Amino acid sequence: FLIKQVAHKLKQENDGLDKFVTLSPAPGFVQWLKEKSINKDADEDMLLKQALIYLTASDREDGSPNDPVAKFHLGNGAILERINLNADLSSKGLIQSKGVMVNYLYKLDRLEENHELFFKTKEVKESDAINNLRKKLQIK
């Protein structure tokens, strides 16, 4: 895994570095909302709920996540760590994702396991924060 090699190199060069988290866009989110006839100007809880569904559910024939960036990171063994509203307020960020950005956490000791699980089952590994958000927003 290239990510594991890069992470180990970074750890060697930066003593104490032990957490590898991305801040990634969700470039198809607004288009997906339009396709689902969901108001992109909904309140924050509704936006969070829809972002979580967009990132973890699939409308695709292969069962992969709707979001191509999610598919990339999850396929590389990351877990869905956090969804951030109003994180990209650039015009492109607002047009493509309503400002939503996503953290993916790479746990180096779990990369292969998560990668294999994702490719076999398309299961999205989620952090405790995402599980708590799921409960709060009443998403199964």
Put a short name on every predicted segment.
Residues 4-140:
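Extended, composition-driven regions rather than compact fold-specific motifs
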